[in-house]
Amino acid sequence: MSQLSYQIPDNGRKKTLLRIPESHTLYLCPGSCGRRQGIRALKNDEADHASFLTFSQADIALGDYIGMVHDAADEVLDAIEPTPRVVTLYVNCIDDFIGTDGAALVEELGARHPGTRFLLSHINPVAADVRGNVAVDIHTNHYAALEPVPCEERDAGVNAVGGFVSVPDSCELRGYLEALGTPVLRELVACTTFDEYSALARSRFNIAVSHLGQDACRMMERRLGIPWMYWPACYDPDELARRYEMLGLALSVLLFDNVTDEGAGTSTAALRLDAAENLLREARVRATEATARALAAVGELPVVVVDTCASLMPFSLALALIKAGFNVAAVFALHSKGNDTEAEEELTREHPEIVVVRKQGLEAMAELGIPHTCVALGRDAAFLLRANHSPDMYHDEGLFGYEGIEKLMDSIAACMEHTERWDA
């Protein structure tokens, strides 16, 4: 019985597929390996933008692999109108054993089809190089088709990199940037044309909004000369204030340069800074008020559980909740990505009473002793504990800045108004 584990059901949450606009995806893999990508493309209405070239053992053994890829690329580009601006080749882990020269393959295809850019991404969970991360590498490759832009063609835009949903229009970040004279917040997920995608290279600053965006920002700093800062999910108002200060310092040079170019002088820049700071103060007040409402709604409930389904920074979220006054009892780190280690170390050092759950086995659940009358942040924890209350939260999506705190706290308060029903 020690090997008995729960299979946490997938409730059908749509998985976002990031794709460069006006691009096509060609999967190169054995038939069984492409099944998951095919099903996801169908579910996301992306089937028209994906093709599959499947290999048999004989194809690989006889050395027909590269020739088949060339033929498949020819066929895809002949069949699709208009011709894709970019074709991304996805190779599965079988390629790690074949040893394809990816750079040479991309160069050959580019010479064969000069109007189309070719990119290569690996889906290689069995690769020996554990330093790599498939999700990070794939995300980074989405920005590889951007071309350097001359300094005189740069604008005051800022890119948000690493997210699967847009920063909400109502988020104070957008108003803050606009007050500083940066009206454009660009995001790959919001691009609908290749020209919009190409404009990402015109921006003067990048914000990596998750660990997935860090390598992409490093690559863009190296290739395109765009500086950046790391801004993963954060629910601590004091830390947010520090980050906005860092962002303001990073953008202040651009702000003063812009108003000088406009002939308005430094007084205009100072007025803009004051307006931006006032906007942040108001947003923080709303977050504080929402936190008070959530604490009142939770009342005497003994626990609040955090899991990696809810947040990509579960330990940071747990610390923020403790700081706000919630009674955190456990962190479910079932799918920890290793990107929240500092907060994890602080939590285990300062709060040894909080349990960190790393497996979903039957014994792990039985030993916790957490009652059903709890608030579980994240569907995994909610399902395993049969929690009475669980706000809808997935990978911090739609939660950014002070508004993110406000929305999270309002969702916690709202979930207290009903009891979850779990099928036996």
Put a short name on every predicted segment.
Residues 1-424:
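An N-terminal assembly and electron-transfer interface module characteristic of large anaerobic redox
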